[in-house]
Amino acid sequence: MISANSLLISTLCAFAIATPLSKRDSCTLTGSSLSSLSTVKKCSSIVIKDLTVPAGQTLDLTGLSSGTTVTFEGTTTFQYKEWSGPLISISGSKISVVGASGHTIDGQGAKWWDGLGDSGKVKPKFVKLALTGTSKVTGLNIKNAPHQVFSINKCSDLTISDITIDIRDGDSAGGHNTDGFDVGSSSNVLIQGCTVYNQDDCIAVNSGSTIKFMNNYCYNGHGISVGSVGGRSDNTVNGFWAENNHVINSDNGLRIKTVEGATGTVTNVNFISNKISGIKSYGIVIEGDYLNSKTTGTATGGVPISNLVMKDITGSVNSTAKRVKILVKNATNWQWSGVSITGGSSYSGCSGIPSGSGASC
C-alpha cells in the first residue's frame, strides 16, 4: 500500500527532474576538460575556476540565456596549438562577465610569440564578444595574450570596464599584434577604466557607431586608433569618443588611419582631454594612405574624414618623434582647439587639412 507521504515525495521528485534549471542554479567548470561545458552553459550562474582549456578548443560560452552571469575564479590557462582561435567566445543578451578577486586569465603568449605577429606562426585570438542588451564585462585580469585580446564584433549596448590587460612580458619576448580592443560592426559600446600594456593598438575601431573609450591608460603599444578603415565588409565609423585617456610610452598617441584606394566613411570622431607622454613616432597622426600595415605617402579620398573634433590634447613626444602628422584628402569640418604637444619636431609634409579647422603640423 502506498502512503500519502510516499506519493507526495514521488511527485516532488518527478517534478524536480522534469523542471529545467532555475535562475538560482550555479554551475562550476574546473579541471582540464570541456566535456561538461554544454551542461554548464544551461546554468544562469557559471563559475570558471582553475580551468585548463585543451589545445585547439574554445571555451565556448556562446548562446547563453538572457541574464546569465559568468565569473572567472583562480587561474584560467590554455594548452598550446597553432590555430586562429578564439580561446574564449561569449555571446548573449544581458550577460554579466566578471572577475573574482585574485583571478587571472593567462594566455601564456610566450608559447606563440615569435616577433612576427600576423606574419609568423598562426596565433589564436583571445576573447571574442558578441554581447547585446546592456551586457557588462568587468574586472577581468588578462595576462600574456598570444594575439589580439578582445574582438568586439556585432555587439550593442555593451559596457566593458576595469579590465587589466598585461602583456608587458611581450616587450622583450616577441609579442606583436596584441591589440587590446578591436571593435567592428558594433554600436553603443562603452570601454572605461581599463589599463592596457601591449604591443599594438590599445583600441582600434574599424567600424561601428557610438563607441566610447574613456578614462583608460594605454602603455607601450601603438596608442588609440580609429582604423584602419576600408577594405572590409563594413567600412563606416560614425561616432567615436576618446576622452580623458592617458597614452604612455607608445609608438603613437592618437591616430586615424584609412586605407589607400578604399571606400568608406569616418565621421563624428571626438578626441577630448587626452594626455600623451613618451611617444616615439607621432603624437597625433591622421593618414589616408594606409596599406598593408604601411603608409604609401599618397593619400586617397575614398574614406573621407569629417566632423573631427580634437580638443584639449596635451603632453609630449620623444626628441626623435613628430608632434603631428596629417596626410588626408577630402576631409571636411574639423575643429581643433587646445592642442599642446611639446618635444620632437614638426612634420613638413602635411596636406589636406580643412581650411579654418585650427589644425596644423
Swiss-Prot record:
PbH1 repeats lie at residues 155-185, 186-207, 208-228, 237-258, 266-288. It catalyses: (1,4-alpha-D-galacturonosyl)n+m + H2O = (1,4-alpha-D-galacturonosyl)n + (1,4-alpha-D-galacturonosyl)m. It is an enzyme of class 3 (hydrolase). Residues 1-18 form the signal peptide. GO terms for biological process: cell wall organization; pectin catabolic process. Disulfide bonds join C27-C43, C202-C218, C350-C361. The active site is at D200, H222. GO terms for cellular component: extracellular region. Keywords: Cell wall biogenesis/degradation, Disulfide bond, Glycoprotein, Glycosidase, Hydrolase, Repeat, Signal. GO terms for molecular function: polygalacturonase activity. Glycans are attached at N318, N330. InterPro entries: Glyco_hydro_28, Glycosyl_hydrlase_28, PbH1, Pectin_lyas_fold, Pectin_lyase_fold/virulence. PROSITE patterns: POLYGALACTURONASE. Its EC number is 3.2.1.15. Belongs to the glycosyl hydrolase 28 family. This is Polygalacturonase.
